[in-house]
Each structure stands twice: as C-alpha cells, then as structure tokens.
C-alpha cells in the first residue's frame, strides 16, 4: 500500500480500544508507535487514581505488539486549558463536559502537535468510536459504526484539518469485535472494563473531588410553588433533570412522585425542584448555543434543518437551526425536550455526518 512508510502515533490509554487500534494499524502497514499521556499530577495517592495501572497496561500491550511506547506529561496544559475552565463553569452554576474540552485542548491539540513536531508523525490515532470520510478535499467526521458506542458527540470541536491528521481504526468495528480481537491476541486489556470516570479524575468519587477545589455552599431546596422542602449541600453537585441524591421524599400534601431538579438560582444559591420527569418546568422548546465549532470551519448563516443531541447517548432530536450572529445560534426542537442543561454541548448531525456544535448558553422554556 502507498501508506506503508507513514508513521502513526497511537494515543495509548491502557484501554482495550487503543490497544486494538495499534494492532489494526500494524495490519494496515503503518509504522506504529504508542504515546501515553499523563494529564494529571496525582497529589493524593487515592486508590481511585488508575494512572499507574493504565501506564503498565499500555506498556504491556506495546511490548506484546513489539512497538515503542513514548510518554509525555501534559499536566500543565491540562490544568490551564481544561481544569480551570471546568472549575469556572461549575462555579457559575453550569455543568461542563470536560471530556469534550480534553479532546479539544489535549488529544487533538497538544498530542497532535507533539506527535508531529517531536516524534515526526504523519498521523495520530485514537481509540474513539468515530469514522472519517474525505469528501471534496475536506475530511468529515462520521458517527462510529457501533451506534451504541459512537463518540462523535465528544469530538465535535475538531476541524477538518485535525480530522485529516487523525485515524480512528475501531470506528469501523463494533465493541464486541474489538474485545474479541484483544482476546485472540492475548492482550492484557481484553477484559478491562471501559473507564467511566471524568478523564482527569479517573474513577474517584466526584463530589469529594470537586469539594477540594470549590468550597461547597449549602442552601435551600424549594419547589416550583415556592415551598422550602430541604437543604442542598452545594449547587455544583446538582444538574438539571437530576433525580438521585436530593435527599427529599414526597411532601405531605403532594404525591409520591420523585423530585427532579428543574432550575438552579445561582444568585440566591437556591435549588428548584418539581415532581415528575415530564414536569413543564423541565421541558424546553429549544436552546441558544454559543462558542460554535463547525467541522468544515465555514461560517454558518441563515437556517438549516438537521438533528441535535443535547447530551451523550440521547436519541437524535429533529430541529431547525438559525444563525443569530457570528457565534450564536437558536435551535428550535420539533418536540419539547427534557433537561436541556446550560454548559453542556449541543451537537448537530446530518445523517451519519457530525456537523459540529456549541455550548448551551440558555434553554428556551415551554411557554407558560
């Protein structure tokens, strides 16, 4: 193949997806090396932090495949460009998605630059479940073949240039196939469970972790009717649509239906709740998004029909998108949607193609 001599640096996380990605690229004739990124300085020796075990697994896989493993420390870049923004958003009462920020600032910026400049790479590769297709000289981002594992939601900030320099080998496979390949090869990561922790926190307890950096401020929990029914330990621990962990049961006069967070009054440190997962206060007819990133990097003007996800693993929502100005859009859903959360990302699709997205600035509530 013509790509034979091309050098690919695979971001090795110590998980099964990046392990199999490295092997697949070897089979395709690339010159493959691995890179393990250290993005967080463990300052606590907590058992939740799995970085050392992940590095050992990445090294074992590279040894088995006969490829070199480089390591790099991006902790300073991570702190400045991901973590501080993450804390600022929480402080402002919003719910950010750090994995999206990490992909934008670390995996497809710091890693991409380091691989090209320091390691002489032609491409980088990751274990993300997405695909790329080159159309009219521009690379497009497509959903992963395994719709259950598709991760395009987390990669919407990438430009066509970044996608052109990236390979996503497992995006063409389904997860069970990936595990089967790892088992057949005898890789230590074959049965390792997928990480669920936020990228820098690993599997540790989120509330405890956040409390170290942002002092919690307890406040009132009130109903949509204005009745005080409890106390929250800090607005930052709660997100719209949340049901668990509120510590309140049904009220004497009310029903036994569960309570849901419908609003956060940051100014007065009040958590607003209502009963029922389809309460009108939980529903939105649309949203305003900002900090837009379109994969083709063409400015968006006018209006378009497409579908949107306002959180990961959500079913696509048909919608109409209208440009408000250079960096803001209005999105109107065909049907009302529950728990649209400021700080999270709205990501747009045309069929299999991920068009891009933006940060939800505000939700447009159901008219009362």
From Swiss-Prot:
Pfam families: tRNA_Me_trans (PF03054), tRNA_Me_trans_C (PF20258), tRNA_Me_trans_M (PF20259). GO terms for molecular function: ATP binding; tRNA binding; tRNA-uridine 2-sulfurtransferase activity. The active site is at residues 102, 199. Coiled coil: none annotated. The keyword Lipoprotein does not apply. The record marks 128, 344 as: Interaction with tRNA. Interacts with TusE. This is tRNA-specific 2-thiouridylase MnmA. It comes from Shigella boydii serotype 4 (strain Sb227).
């Amino acid at each position: 193949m013509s790509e034979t001599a091309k050098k690919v640096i695979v971001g090795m996380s110590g998980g099964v997806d990046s392990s199999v990605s490295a092997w697949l690229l070897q089979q395709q004739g690339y010159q493959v090396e691995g890179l393990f990124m250290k993005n967080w300085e463990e300052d606590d020796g907590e058992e939740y932090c799995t970085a050392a075990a992940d590095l050992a697994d990445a090294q074992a896989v590279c040894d088995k495949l006969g490829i070199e493993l480089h390591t790099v420390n991006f902790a300073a870049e991570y702190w400045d460009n991901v973590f501080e923004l993450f804390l600022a958003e929480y402080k402002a009462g919003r719910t950010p998605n750090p994995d999206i920020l990490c992909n934008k600032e670390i995996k497809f910026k710091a890693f991409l630059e380091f691989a090209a400049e320091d390691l002489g790479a032609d491409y980088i590769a990751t274990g993300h479940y997405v695909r790329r297709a080159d159309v009219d000289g521009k690379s497009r981002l497509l959903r992963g073949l395994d719709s259950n594992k598709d991760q395009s939601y987390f990669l919407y900030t990438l430009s066509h240039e970044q996608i052109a320099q990236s390979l996503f080998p497992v995006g063409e496979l389904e997860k069970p196939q990936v595990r089967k390949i790892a088992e057949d090869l005898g890789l230590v990561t074959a049965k390792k469970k997928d990480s669920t922790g936020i990228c820098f926190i690993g599997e540790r307890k989120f509330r405890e972790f956040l409390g170290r950096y942002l002092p919690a401020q307890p406040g009132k929990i009130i109903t949509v009717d204005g009745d005080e029914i409890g106390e929250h330990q800090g607005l930052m621990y709660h997100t719209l649509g949340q049901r668990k962990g509120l510590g309140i049961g049904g009220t004497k006069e009310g029903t036994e239906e569960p309570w849901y967070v419908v609003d956060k009054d940051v100014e007065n440190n009040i958590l607003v709740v209502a009963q029922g997962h389809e309460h009108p206060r939980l529903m939105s007819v649309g949203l305003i998004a900002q900090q837009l990133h379109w994969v083709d990097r063409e400015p968006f003007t006018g209006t378009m029909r497409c579908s949107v996800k306002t959180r990961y693993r959500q079913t696509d929502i048909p919608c109409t998108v209208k440009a408000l100005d250079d960096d803001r859009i209005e999105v109107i859903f065909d049907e009302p949607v529950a728990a649209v959360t400021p700080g999270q990302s709205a990501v747009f699709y045309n069929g299999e193609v991920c068009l891009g997205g933006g940060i939800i600035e505000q939700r447009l509530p159901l008219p009362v």
